[in-house]
Amino acid sequence: MATIKVDVVSAEEQIFSGEAKFVALPGETGELGILPGHTPLITRIRPGAVRIEVEGGNDEFVFVAGGILEVQPGAVTVLADTAIRGKDLDAAKAEEARKRAEETLQNAKSDLDLAKAQSELATAMAQLEAIQRLAKIRSRH
């Protein structure tokens, strides 16, 4: 089966680099599915889970807190603001981040504080959702 080169990088490190049969991720206007030979595309990514279907059936999962997606016919590049490998996701930390963001939202004194708190809350909620999706998938295997 045809594959596509996939790179997922954050400001800190390269998270994934390899060949994949399929990539699914949260685009700005909805979920995107990328197959080998996909038409070129550049778009923003919302916070959420990136699923990389590799040969052999072991999918790779990465949580991204937003970023940019570039697709070329033979390559997919995810430039993430922040990225965490699926195996490194921590539900307790994500829940704590959600609580802090909700508290900050309640106490926001300016539009800037409000916007920052809303962004942090959206990221924490997306991370918790990604953790739940990953747990559901792992329980099936």
Swiss-Prot record:
Q: Name one GO molecular function term.
A: ATP binding
Q: Which residues cross the membrane?
A: none
Q: What InterPro entries does UniProt report for this protein, alphabetically?
A: ATP_F1_dsu/esu_C_sf, ATP_synth_F1_dsu/esu, ATP_synth_F1_dsu/esu_N, ATP_synth_F1_esu_C, ATPsynth_dsu/esu_N
Q: Which residues form a coiled coil?
A: none
Q: Which SUPFAM superfamilies match?
A: Epsilon subunit of F1F0-ATP synthase C-terminal domain (SSF46604), Epsilon subunit of F1F0-ATP synthase N-terminal domain (SSF51344)
- Membrane association type: Peripheral membrane protein
The answer to keyword Cell membrane applying to this record is yes
Q: Does the keyword Chaperone apply?
A: no
Query: Main localization of the protein?
Result: membrane
Specify the signal sequence span: none
**Example of a GO cellular component annotation carried by this entry:** plasma membrane
Tell me the Pfam families matching this sequence: ATP-synt_DE, ATP-synt_DE_N
Print the keywords alphabetically.
ATP synthesis, Cell inner membrane, Cell membrane, CF(1), Hydrogen ion transport, Ion transport, Membrane, Transport
Cellular location(s): Cell inner membrane
**What exactly does this protein do?**
Produces ATP from ADP in the presence of a proton gradient across the membrane.
What does the record note on quaternary structure? F-type ATPases have 2 components, CF(1) - the catalytic core - and CF(0) - the membrane proton channel. CF(1) has five subunits: alpha(3), beta(3), gamma(1), delta(1), epsilon(1). CF(0) has three main subunits: a, b and c.
Q: Which family does it belong to?
A: Belongs to the ATPase epsilon chain family.
Question: Record's HAMAP family?
Answer: ATP_synth_epsil_bac (MF_00530)
Q: Quote the protein name from its UniProt record.
A: ATP synthase epsilon chain
